[in-house]
């Protein structure tokens, strides 16, 4: 397994997905990136079991295919020291030894067994709900609500963003029982009624990726997991189980007092 890749491009992709890696992993293999080279496509996966991120990079100079788990911290620390240059990865598939050749020298990394890396959860087709959304809409929905989520171990449903699909609108809700934010978009029509609770950590990771993208996002979910697919990236997260509070009941419907203020002055 051998390929050539830009040092800065690789680092950019690893930094995007590397934030999911926990400092307290229960499985040592989760301290690694999974490199999966097939044809001219390199898929790199990072996971903490609850959330999995996958990034895809198209390559031009490839010899053979294969998989290997690469120590995340070691690789990222090395890449941060390289200026922009082509890097050659040469992996011995029997020993899993990784030889990294740069313009300044040669480096060796001990890879891990890729078969130990956990499988990505799949959305069950018989229970799947799917829709296409503009990346701007998903970004705004997360960005305008995530600050209001709670950090409450006793009420985990409050620690995520409640996403509610209706026939003619899409609503994002977050509350910590002291403040509540409802962000509703009328410019989309899901044409179905459903909902899920998106945990805070993967929501934050997705927001970071969406801030650089202008595209369509494919959203699909079942009763256990949600998946977001956009150009070059995929994120799969386990959903928070439970019933979200009836947020509409605490929003006044006939409050006679209204105030309009300048946002910048405020």
What are these regions (language model features)?
Residues 1-266:
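Structural preference for solvent-exposed beta-strand-turn elements
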